[in-house]
A protein has these predicted regions:
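N-terminal export leaders
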Residues: 3-7
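Bacterial N-terminal signal peptides
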Residues: 9-18
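Sec/Tat signal peptide C-region and signal peptidase I cleavage site
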Residues: 19-23
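Metallo-beta-lactamase
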Residues: 24, 35, 58-60, 65-68, 117-247, ...
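Conserved beta-strand hairpin/beta-sheet module of binuclear metal-dependent hydrolase folds
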Residues: 31-77, 170-174, 178-184
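Active-site HxH/HxHxD metal-binding segment of metal-dependent hydrolases
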Residues: 78-148
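Accessory terminal helices/loops
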Residues: 216-222, 231-313
Length: 313
């Protein structure tokens, strides 16, 4: 079994403040957003989520900057009579490299992204075949492992996670609000995994396992958990997600060990027991199995290379 799946090493936040007073989750801004904590809102469009923190000091926006989601967020902020957006915390996901900074930079905000995502955005900006969405630009700042952003009464901790959706996975803990955003977590179905961009199934499972383990005794510190897609979640639902990922990885890994091709792995339906719950979202069971297969093959190749290097010394 892959040692990453066996260990599911904890890579999360080690020091977090107590939970702020929790506001009842309620629809606000004329139905454009849901308030999940004091001064903290979630905007949803086509299943994807964007986080808005509207403080007296300004606004912080976090998530994948899909144009339709950004447009809805702007309408919500106007309805909330919020101040100017000061920070845009960009997260990776399908299409993120072309979404640039979401257009927040030209409105005066400082946009920042994990350095791998920022690099792909920069590459897209220089490639005629994959231009950035009109009105967007390369984020002004990048970070490698962690960055902390203080704005008024809110402090956001952006922490690099194991490669999951891509090599630019990150988690954001909003300490003032006491909520967590995970870009590799999905509640509406199987997660996206871009293996070519450095992603891998084991990394998605590691991230989920780390938060489940580290906050099992204090779930209120990170709940509600805001996934990239789907409804707000509890730590129990994150645990269910993690258990599914580990089981699928183990099943696909065995198929690879048995010499099955990717098409044969798909035909074996290793996700069959999970499809009723997880197979109805935008990522089909077949697509998920193909990504899982590629992830396992890549992990086994990396492990073989490490062992080869060890024998050479």
């Amino acid at each position: 079994m892959n040692r990453r799946i066996m260990s599911l090493a904890a890579t999360a936040f080690v020091c977090l403040s107590p939970l702020a007073a929790r506001a009842q989750q309620q629809v606000v801004a004329g139905g454009l957003a849901v308030q999940v904590a004091p001064r903290t809102y979630v905007v949803t469009e086509q299943g994807a989520n964007l986080v808005l923190v509207a403080d007296s000091a300004g606004v912080m926006v976090a998530g994948v900057q899909a144009p339709a989601l950004v447009a809805k967020a702007r309408r919500a902020l106007a309805a909330l009579h919020a101040g100017p957006v000061r920070y845009a915390l960009l997260m990776d996901g399908p299409g993120a490299a072309r979404y640039g900074d979401g257009g927040w930079g030209q409105r005066g905000a400082v946009a920042l992204a994990q350095e791998e995502l920022r690099g792909r955005i920069r590459h897209a900006s220089r490639t005629p075949a994959t231009p950035l969405v009109a009105g967007t630009r390369v984020p002004a700042m990048g970070y490698s492992e962690v960055v902390q952003v203080l704005m008024g009464r809110e402090e956001a901790h952006c922490v690099k996670q194991p490669s999951g959706y891509s090599g630019a996975d990150a988690a954001i803990h909003f300490e003032g609000a006491g909520v967590l955003y995970l870009n590799s977590f999905t509640m509406d179905g199987y997660p996206d995994i871009d293996v070519e961009a450095g992603g891998g199934l084991a990394g998605v499972a590691e991230t989920a396992a780390a938060f489940v383990t580290n906050f099992a005794e204090a779930p209120q510190v990170i709940e509600p958990i805001i996934p990239a897609r789907g409804q707000l979640a509890t730590i129990g639902q994150l645990r269910e997600f993690k258990d599914m990922l580990v089981a699928v990885y183990e099943r696909v890994e065995q198929l690879v060990k048995d010499g099955k091709t990717v098409d044969q792995a798909v035909a074996a339906r290793p996700t069959a027991s999970f499809d009723a719950r997880w197979g109805r979202g935008p990522v089909s069971p077949e697509r998920f199995v193909r990504a899982a297969y590629a992830s396992v093959v890549k992990d086994r190749q990396a492990e073989a290379a490490r062992q080869g290097q060890g024998h050479s010394h």
